[in-house]
Amino acid sequence: MEACSRKRRRRRAYTTSTTGYAAVFFCGIFVFAQFGISSSALFAPDHYPSLPRKAGHFHEMASFQAPKATVSFTGQRREEENRDEVYKDDKRLVHTGPNPLHN
């Protein structure tokens, strides 16, 4: 009878110590997570002393606005038949001969 009560005490002590270790472990994770979140808030983009030159203009623009186009076409549009004259390329020409990929 006495041996049985010793086992219960050991088992109870083991269970409470394991539960205590687990509670301390999860509290430690919680504290470090909160510390990480609060320290990352210090380095938010609006808190940097100076932005890189390329990123400066990008961050000033609202996220829903598209960037302005820098290329504008003001000349006359070319007709379809004039394109072949400009590039001097016949699109229907099929090159024949040995295939260089198959030796």
UniProtKB/Swiss-Prot annotation:
GO terms for cellular component: apoplast. Keywords: Developmental protein, Differentiation, Glycoprotein, Hydroxylation, Secreted, Signal. Residues 76-93 have a biased composition (Basic and acidic residues). The keyword Glycoprotein applies. Glycans are attached at residue 98. Residues 1-21 form the signal peptide. The modification Hydroxyproline is found at residue 98. Belongs to the CLV3/ESR signal peptide family. This is CLAVATA3/ESR (CLE)-related protein 16.
